Amino acid sequence: METWQEVTVHVHRDAQEAVSHVLIETGSQGVAIADSADYIGQKDRFGELYPDVEQSDMIAITAYYPSSTNLADVIATINEQLAELASFGLQVGQVTVDSQELAEEDWADNWKKYYEPARITHDLTIVPSWTDYDASAGEKVIKLDPGMAFGTGTHPTTKMSLFALEQILRGGETVIDVGTGSGVLSIASSLLGAKTIYAYDLDDVAVRVAQENIDLNQGTDNIHVAAGDLLKGVSQEADVIVANILADILVLLTDDAYRLVKKEGYLILSGIISEKLDMVLEAAFSAGFFLETHMIQGEWNALVFKKTDDISGVIGG
């Protein structure tokens, strides 16, 4: 029986996305995230009851490596990369690293124990595909089986993207989802009434996973997934373009986004740590967009821009 090595890194939740990327880059076959915040604060907003969980700013990110991996070298590299992230201003927190061996059948499903149904916005709830869930009246359920290499839809950057889509979409829109990952934003767009959604990702694995997740959800035949490098070569105009990726990548798509967004349409940009906020704002303003909404959760920012001639109540351009 093949065994796997499990490495758990305890960091501040604001570093979740960056640290997950570090773990994948060091050879992990996937990551699982345990965050008490996924269960805290939902009761007051939506009236549901959740288990009592002690809230902490720290989260546990567990990575899985083949048994042949030199774990000492991997852990040394992880510590070096985390120190570098901290030097860039990202709030990493007090880092601790644990490791253990894991049998293959445990590795295959171990990450699932951290993944529970989560009410993300007023209308949208993300539910693991293997979970039976009774939706309440008006509740829109997104079924996901992201695998270990993709987020479960509960990261602040995803939450803010979903909230923005819920506020903007009224039915009949064309949406472009750049860097679709698990496909969660495309699925949400369909459930919120968008007529047609085009989802792009540079990663072939993401394209496959997104399509598999789309197939889990009824009424999502209007989502078209394809490999693509941001918006290069795209000619389809859209009412809404949404991208939840790193800030350094977001600044590369603002000009193409302005070309493709229809008049009075929207550009939603998320995945922006506070230190990179001005850089993204400058790129979007230079492209011609006006800022309509700025959302903040911890160190993360999401921005909603509009392509308009009516500049009352908006900033930039």
Curated annotation (Swiss-Prot):
Compartments, record wording: Cytoplasm
Top-level taxon of origin: Bacteria
Name of the protein in question: Ribosomal protein L11 methyltransferase
EC top class named in words: transferase
InterPro entries: Ribosomal_L11_MeTrfase_PrmA, Ribosomal_PrmA_MeTrfase, SAM-dependent_MTases_sf
Organism expressing this protein natively: Streptococcus pyogenes serotype M18 (strain MGAS8232)
GO molecular function, one term: protein-lysine N-methyltransferase activity
Entry's Gene Ontology cellular component terms: cytoplasm
Transmembrane segments: none
Catalytic activity, as annotated: L-lysyl-[protein] + 3 S-adenosyl-L-methionine = N(6),N(6),N(6)-trimethyl-L-lysyl-[protein] + 3 S-adenosyl-L-homocysteine + 3 H(+)
Binding site for S-adenosyl-L-methionine: 158, 179, 201, 244
EC id: 2.1.1.-
Family according to the record: Belongs to the methyltransferase superfamily. PrmA family.
Pfam family, one: PrmA
Functional summary from the UniProt entry: Methylates ribosomal protein L11.
